[in-house]
Swiss-Prot record:
Cited NCBIfam families: dapD, PRK11830.1
Pfam families, alphabetized: Hexapep_2, THDPS_N_2
Organism encoding this protein: Neisseria meningitidis serogroup B (strain ATCC BAA-335 / MC58)
Substrates-to-products reaction catalysed: (S)-2,3,4,5-tetrahydrodipicolinate + succinyl-CoA + H2O = (S)-2-succinylamino-6-oxoheptanedioate + CoA
Protein name: 2,3,4,5-tetrahydropyridine-2,6-dicarboxylate N-succinyltransferase
GO cellular component: cytoplasm
UniProt-listed GO biological process terms: diaminopimelate biosynthetic process; lysine biosynthetic process; lysine biosynthetic process via diaminopimelate
Keywords: Acyltransferase, Amino-acid biosynthesis, Cytoplasm, Diaminopimelate biosynthesis, Lysine biosynthesis, Repeat, Transferase
Family according to the record: Belongs to the transferase hexapeptide repeat family.
The keyword Transmembrane belongs to this UniProt entry's keyword annotation: no
Assembly and oligomerization: Homotrimer.
Length: 273
């Protein structure tokens, strides 16, 4: 039986699984899946093209099962003690393991085991949850959080206090995805499986969930659930039909191509909007 089949079958009977009742086969399958997520060999979601992703539901199910097969235990990072089911990613790492991994993790940075952090990533005091994938060259700035199973692309900058939503609590169908070369401004929140397509710039304090209307002021088009590639987005509002009030929305103020994005600073893109 394949790893996927074992996980799928076990998930159907998850209510009966506890640390004392789990079978050796299921436990090893779950732990092996977590190991593969941790190493980057397996991802919860795989990119097929711009804005197109395939979700490996069974990998997400393995993450959920991992909470059922383990008891809470005391965890120690050398400074503080914690009581949880999931150890941190590099709790037992040696200097050589850090060098081989090729990323920086400054004091205060936390990544849970089962998350993947690629080479040349910088983790400031931030949090990367289980199942997440942070690709090469990304910056996870201070107090930013990368939620469970979220996918962060190459050269993405998550500014201070940014929240990228997870999919486990509450359970969501698809992970939140930030594609390559995106900039997410300070204190912004992208949640509920929204996809920010490559090369987009999200200004400070923009909140986008599945129900958020994303208004393109150039074309008049309204998007939900995704930010089109190369968008520059700020927070705004849309009037109600009767004009009695306005509701929050995100506004695409301009589109930029990769060449313009490479030559232009983020501040310049957001000026004169």
């Amino acid at each position: 039986m394949s790893l996927q089949n074992i996980i799928e079958t076990a998930f159907e009977n998850r209510a009966d699984i506890t640390p004392t009742t789990v079978t050796p086969e299921v436990k090893e399958a779950v732990l092996e899946t977590i190991r593969q997520l941790d190493s980057g060999k397996l991802r919860v979601a795989e990119r097929l093209g711009v804005g197109e992703w395939k979700v490996n539901e069974w990998a997400k199910k393995a993450v959920l099962l991992s909470f059922r097969i383990q008891d809470n235990e005391v965890l120690n990072d050398g400074v503080n003690k914690y009581f949880d089911k999931v150890p941190t990613k590099f709790a037992d790492w040696s200097e050589d393991e850090f060098k081989n991994a090729g990323f920086r993790a400054v004091p205060g940075a936390v990544a849970r085991r089962g998350s993947f952090v690629a080479k040349n990533v910088v983790l400031m005091p931030s949090y990367v949850n289980i199942g997440a994938y942070v690709d090469e060259g990304a910056m996870v700035d201070t107090w930013a959080t990368v939620g469970s199973c979220a996918q962060i692309g190459k050269n993405v900058h998550l500014s201070g206090g940014v929240g990228i939503g997870g999919v486990l609590e509450p359970l969501q169908a698809a992970p939140t995805i930030i594609e390559d070369n995106c900039f997410i401004g300070a204190r912004s929140e992208i949640v509920e499986g929204v996809i920010v397509e490559e090369g987009s710039v999200i200004s400070m304090g923009v909140f986008i969930g599945q129900s958020t209307k994303i208004f393109d002021r150039t074309t008049g088009e309204i998007y939900q659930g995704r930010v089109p590639a190369g968008s520059v987005v700020v927070s705004g509002s849309m009037p109600s039909k009767d004009g009695s009030h306005s509701l929050y929305c995100a506004v695409i103020v301009k589109r930029v191509d990769a060449q313009t994005r490479a030559k232009t600073s983020v501040n310049e893109l957001l000026r004169g909007i």
